[in-house]
Amino acid sequence: MSNVGTTGRIPLWFIGVIAGIAALSIVGLFFYGAYSGLGSSL
């Protein structure tokens, strides 16, 4: 297996890690905003 399956120079696992961190950050900010009372505007 070569790097044909990957998107360009970026490994697929790296994209998965970044997407996971971004998703956790968005969910964390949403729950933090809802807990502090600022998430009610969303």
Swiss-Prot record:
Q: Which residues cross the membrane?
A: 10-30
| InterPro entries in alphabetical order | PSII_PsbJ, PSII_PsbJ_sf
Q: Which GO terms describe its cellular component?
A: chloroplast thylakoid membrane; photosystem II reaction center
Q: Where in the cell is it found?
A: Plastid, Chloroplast thylakoid membrane
Domain of life (superkingdom): Eukaryota
Ordered alphabetically, the record's keywords are: Chloroplast, Membrane, Photosynthesis, Photosystem II, Plastid, Reaction center, Thylakoid, Transmembrane, Transmembrane helix
Q: How is the protein disposed in the membrane?
A: Single-pass membrane protein
One example of a Gene Ontology biological process annotation: photosynthesis
Mainly localized where?
Answer: plastid
One Pfam family of this chain: PsbJ
Q: What does this protein do?
A: One of the components of the core complex of photosystem II (PSII). PSII is a light-driven water:plastoquinone oxidoreductase that uses light energy to abstract electrons from H(2)O, generating O(2) and a proton gradient subsequently used for ATP formation. It consists of a core antenna complex that captures photons, and an electron transfer chain that converts photonic excitation into a charge separation.
- Sorted alphabetically, which HAMAP family does this protein's record hold? PSII_PsbJ
Give the protein family: Belongs to the PsbJ family.
Question: Which NCBIfam families does this entry report, sorted A to Z?
Answer: PRK02565.1
Q: Which PANTHER family match?
A: PHOTOSYSTEM II REACTION CENTER PROTEIN J
Subunit architecture: PSII is composed of 1 copy each of membrane proteins PsbA, PsbB, PsbC, PsbD, PsbE, PsbF, PsbH, PsbI, PsbJ, PsbK, PsbL, PsbM, PsbT, PsbX, PsbY, PsbZ, Psb30/Ycf12, at least 3 peripheral proteins of the oxygen-evolving complex and a large number of cofactors. It forms dimeric complexes.
Name of the protein described by the UniProt record: Photosystem II reaction center protein J
